[in-house]
């Protein structure tokens, strides 16, 4: 999600929390954890903010197809769900609504909005589960997180 023009403090906070939940979820994607650990990381960051975690759309595995198993919900319980195995490639994509967790698809059958037409945010990275730790494949890795970067995009952390 990118803000267009000047945005107010409430929108900036929604964007910040959504992006932080992405990086915390990525950190949870380690060998030996489970898919539920990823959703639990999102929930832990969002808890107490008043934001709704969109549950009807999920992250997913990637491989021969764009959308593969496992589904990676943005809610979960630590230690639950399919195990995370070395070599898995996942799209992790937290989505939050400022005032609801409900969504609606418009008549074009593509555009998704929050059910109350309020603000929402979505951040996503594709990552690999490796024995060295979570490796972000699709963009730079911000400082302060225990993540590996792509050797191409982040030569210093790759």
Identify the meaning behind each predicted range.
Residues 1-158:
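Active-site neighborhoods and metal-handling regions in enzymes and metal-associated proteins
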């Amino acid at each position: 999600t990118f803000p267009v023009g000047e945005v107010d403090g409430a929108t900036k906070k929604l964007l910040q929390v959504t992006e932080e939940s992405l990086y915390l979820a990525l950190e949870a994607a380690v060998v030996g954890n489970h898919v539920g650990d990823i959703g639990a990381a999102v929930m832990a960051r969002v808890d107490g903010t008043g934001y709704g975690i969109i549950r009807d759309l999920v992250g997913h595995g990637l491989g021969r197809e764009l959308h593969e198993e496992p589904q990676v919900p943005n809610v979960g319980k630590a230690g639950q769900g399919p195990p995370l195995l070395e070599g898995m490639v996942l799209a992790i994509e937290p989505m939050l609504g400022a005032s609801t967790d409900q969504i609606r698809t418009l008549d074009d059958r593509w555009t998704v909005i929050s059910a109350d037409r309020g603000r929402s945010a979505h951040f996503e990275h594709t990552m690999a589960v490796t024995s060295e730790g979570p490796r972000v494949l699709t963009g730079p890795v911000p400082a302060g997180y225990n993540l590996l970067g792509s050797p191409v995009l982040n030569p210093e952390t790759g």
